[in-house]
Regions:
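A short, conserved alpha-helix within the catalytic core of class I
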Residues: 145-156
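SAM cofactor-binding core of SAM-dependent methyltransferases
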Residues: 24-123
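Rossmann-like AdoMet/SAM-dependent catalytic core
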Residues: 192-265
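Conserved beta-strand signature within the Rossmann-like core of class I S-adenosyl-L-methionine
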Residues: 162-177
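Short, conserved loop/helix-junction motifs that constitute active-site signature segments
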Residues: 76-80, 130, 156-161
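Short amphipathic alpha-helix with an adjacent loop that forms part of the alpha/beta core around
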Residues: 121-131, 154-157
Length: 265
């Protein structure tokens, strides 16, 4: 097994749970995509903050979102749709490590692209424009708010609202990573979500515009990092009730109050 590259990225005790839920959501969606009423025959599964594919939490190694995405797609047992994986990160060493780990883990080779998240989103937009039969399944797990491609994703959703699932994963550690250090004073960052380029103003609403729908995860009691996952869907609204997993409808009153909570209201 190759050695893990030491890169500048954070994690918390909730990282394992978050990564597992990415895999669970992916498997759920790809089981849905088996329906004959799903009209797209090619899906791009993208993570534009892919990292190394592994997180170190104390003395435990936890698989990251790219690995959980691959597992979710393979676990859905859906062989009727062509799937292309698109992984990118701004760090060359992280991309190299991820490529090696995927080969070791799955015995397949998937290209990893060294680029800014904003450039990756623009490239994915060009891919969508090139073929009307392509659907995009996009995970956003940013390294820092300055890198978060809010405007690019918004523009993409305006142009292709029915052809994209967007699953943002945001935590307070993104703010700390951007600042270059954790909050040594121990202060809780009440408004961290709003600080991501006014994440709540325009972006959250764009996730469910033009007939789109989505969920937001209820806050975890005692989670000082305040991470949240906001899975949103372009078509085929999931029939599964994930309320037992603490997801609520993003457009419901509870969903709106949850957004306010994460924005420090």
């Amino acid at each position: 097994m190759s050695e893990i590259v030491k890169t500048f990225q954070g994690s918390s005790v909730h990282t394992k749970r978050k990564e597992q839920e990415i895999g669970g959501l992916t498997k759920m969606r790809f089981n849905q995509f088996k329906s004959p009423y799903f009209k797209f025959n090619n899906i791009y599964v993208a993570d534009v903050f892919s990292g190394t594919g592994r997180n170190v939490i104390i003395d435990e190694i936890v698989d990251g979102s790219p690995i959980k995405l691959i597992e979710g797609v393979m676990g859905a047992n859906n062989r009727n749709i062509d799937v292309n994986f698109f992984f990118s990160d701004v760090r060359t060493d992280a991309c190299e490590q991820l490529h090696k780990y995927i080969v070791e883990r799955f015995k397949i080779s998937i290209a990893t692209n060294v680029m800014l998240a904003s450039d990756a989103i623009n490239m994915l937009g060009s891919i969508l424009k090139s073929n009307p039969n392509i659907f995009l399944y996009l995970v956003l797990d940013p390294n820092g708010p300055k890198d978060f491609p809010k405007n690019e994703v918004h523009d993409l959703l305006c142009e292709f609202p029915k052809r994209i699932d967007v699953i943002p994963n945001i935590s307070a550690t993104t703010i700390n990573r951007c600042l270059g250090a954790r909050d040594k004073a121990g202060r809780q960052m009440q408004g961290w979500l709003a600080n991501i380029e006014n994440f709540d103003e325009g972006f959250v609403s764009s996730l469910t515009m033009k007939g789109r729908c989505g969920w937001i995860r209820r806050p975890i009691k005692g989670d000082r990092f305040r991470w949240v996952i906001v899975p949103t869907f372009g078509c085929f609204k999931p029939k599964n009730n994930w309320e037992k997993q603490d997801y609520v409808d993003l457009n419901s009153e509870e969903g709106k109050e949850t957004v306010k909570f994460y924005c420090g209201a």
